[in-house]
Curated annotation (Swiss-Prot):
InterPro entries: IGF2 (IPR022334), IGF2_C (IPR013576), Insulin-like (IPR016179), Insulin-like_growth_factor (IPR022350), Insulin-like_sf (IPR036438), Insulin_CS (IPR022353), Insulin_family (IPR022352). It comes from Oncorhynchus mykiss. This is Insulin-like growth factor 2. The lineage of its organism: Eukaryota, Metazoa, Chordata, Craniata, Vertebrata. Residues 112-117 are annotated as: D. The gene is igf2. Residues 91-111 are annotated as: A. Its main location: secreted. Residues 80-90 are annotated as: C. The insulin-like growth factors, isolated from plasma, are structurally and functionally related to insulin but have a much higher growth-promoting activity. Acts as a ligand for integrin which is required for IGF2 signaling.
């Protein structure tokens, strides 16, 4: 009887140990899954924060000049009469410096939109009398107001070059322009100071009127 009781006790303890081991394994698996979920959430948050880049001050002006080039740019988007009541004009400084900035947003604040080949061909074929005289007077007002604010930035070109191009402009669209600029700088740097003639000077034949001074 005692042996049977001992055998039953050992068998019960063995089953208890098995159940405890399985419970521990389940707990370990659940904790590892939680750690993986937390790590994935952190990585997604870091990627979102990194993608939402902000530009302020001189970096914002450099980015606008690099994107818009000769077209010029505005700090506040020109609003129409229909959209002035519905939406508030926040401005590029508030959007890029305090929220997030991307290339599409910078393109919206350029003064003149980039015309495609279809638009250029369509405007060249259309003949509109007396309209060019009106269009020529409008941009002059914007140019006088626009470029008078940036004379200080144009004088400090060395500081803009030291800061470099922001990371948001390292897209595929603007890499070709950077390569062209570098090629032009290298061509100007490696230009020879003295250009040697390609042809040798003509050799004169020896003359018979040679006088020896010995």
């Amino acid at each position: 009887m005692e042996t049977q009781k001992r055998h039953e006790y050992h068998s019960v303890c063995h089953t208890c140990r098995r159940t405890e081991n399985t419970r521990m394994k389940v707990k370990m698996m659940s904790s590892s899954n939680r750690v993986l979920v937390i790590a994935l959430a952190l990585t997604l948050y870091i990627v979102e924060v990194a993608s939402a880049e902000t530009l302020c001050g001189g970096e914002l002006v450099d980015a606008l000049q690099f994107v818009c080039e000769d077209r010029g740019f505005y700090f506040s988007r020109p609003t129409s009469r229909s959209n002035s009541r519905r939406s508030q004009n926040r401005g590029i400084v508030e959007e890029c410096c305090f929220r997030s900035c991307d290339l599409n947003l910078l393109e919206q604040y350029c003064a003149k939109p980039a015309k495609s080949e279809r638009d250029v061909s369509a405007t060249s074929l259309q003949i509109i009398p007396m309209v060019p005289t009106i269009k020529q007077d409008v941009p002059r007002k914007h140019v006088t107001v626009k470029y008078s604010k940036y004379e200080a930035w144009q004088r400090k070109a060395a500081q803009r070059l030291r800061r470099g191009v922001p990371a948001i402009l390292r897209a595929r669209k603007f890499r070709r322009q950077a390569v062209k600029i570098k090629a032009q700088e290298q061509a100007m740097f490696h230009r020879p100071l003295i250009t040697l003639p390609s042809k040798l000077p003509p050799v004169l034949p020896p003359t018979d009127n040679y006088v020896s001074h010995n």
